[in-house]
Design a protein with these regions (language model features):
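Rossmann-like adenosine-cofactor binding region
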Residues: 176-244
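Helix N-cap at the beta1-alpha1 junction of Rossmann-like dinucleotide-binding domains, i.e.
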Residues: 20, 163-164, 228
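Conserved S-adenosyl-L-methionine
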Residues: 150-155, 239-243
Length: 287
């Protein structure tokens, strides 16, 4: 590539994961780049952990960055040249920024899930959060724990389905300098006392809680899922008078920060959200 054409005219980005065909990320990013007047493309690439090193090496210089789903958020870390302090603390990078070209290229890992969660909660709880419950102990739970630390939450209870599988979350808590209380599923007593309940568990995992311990008036329920949506717990919580945030809002907020990292420009969040809502409505009509 000659010096006169060192920067490709059309830039590219992609989301990696398996399965990935369901992802709404391409819809959100396409909306953002259209509003910003950029000739950028954003695609979904099927990729599992074993394929990740090969896919990473195959990307040409038109790529500005990547979005990653679990478990790739953790698997990518040893393949990067630089990792932000936040991504190191959380133990996951959902975003890769490509800095430089050719022999000067460096791949930098960032975590935009954490500021995405912070933004989503702050919009609904501008006066702050006293205490919170996280359902689940996986990678997204670690991001939620970091977000709650940034929000100044002193007491966080993590409800886990298997204490033996919560080791990585405990290590994350140590890196963050926080001491959450881990309790066994379903943690109904903790649910009833929380200002905010964040669910990071798979679809269907909270269905039984929907009939027994939904969020109530004065509480905020935040589910990271957007497909399927709404979940039974979200429906029951709304009926009980709770405020509810769906996973689309997290997807929009974390994607907006990816756009800003890659372009250096403010992301058009409203247009991204509208595109995501339209895509979800279309899926609902066709299902």
């Amino acid at each position: 590539m000659s010096p006169l054409s060192a920067v490709p005219a059309v830039r590219r980005a992609a989301v990696l994961g398996s399965p990935i065909a369901h992802s709404l990320s391409p819809v959100l990013h396409a909306a953002a780049y259209q509003v910003l007047g950029l000739r950028w493309s954003y695609s979904a690439i099927e990729c599992d952990e074993a394929q990740l090193p090969g896919v990473l090496m195959s990307l040409d210089e038109s790529f500005v960055g990547l979005s990653l789903t679990m478990p790739l958020k953790r698997a990518i870390l040893p393949l990067l040249d630089d990792v932000s302090e936040l991504a190191v603390a959380v133990g996951a990078a959902n975003t890769v920024v490509f800095d430089g070209l050719g022999p000067f290229l460096r791949r930098r890992g960032e975590n935009t899930d954490v500021p995405g969660i912070v933004a989503a909660i702050t919009a609904r709880r501008p006066d702050g959060v006293r205490n919170a419950v996280i359902l689940g102990a996986g990678g997204t739970a670690a991001a939620a724990l970091a977000a709650l630390r940034e929000l100044g939450v002193d007491g966080t209870v993590v409800v886990v389905r298997d204490q033996a599988r919560a080791g990585e979350l405990r290590r994350c808590a140590d890196r963050l300098g926080v001491t959450p209380t881990l309790v066994d599923w379903p943690g109904r007593a903790a649910l009833g006392e929380a200002d905010v309940i964040i669910s990071t568990v798979p679809a269907g995992a909270t269905d039984q809680l929907a009939t027994q311990s939904p969020a109530a008036h004065g509480q905020l329920f935040f589910d990271v899922l957007y497909d399927p949506w709404p979940t039974a717990f979200a429906v029951a919580s709304l009926a009980a008078g709770a405020a509810v945030i769906g996973g689309l809002e997290l997807l929009v907020q974390q994607a907006a920060r990816q756009v800003e990292l890659w372009t250096g420009r403010p992301a058009p969040i409203e247009e991204m959200r509208a595109a995501g809502e339209a895509a979800m409505a279309s899926r609902s009509e066709s299902s």
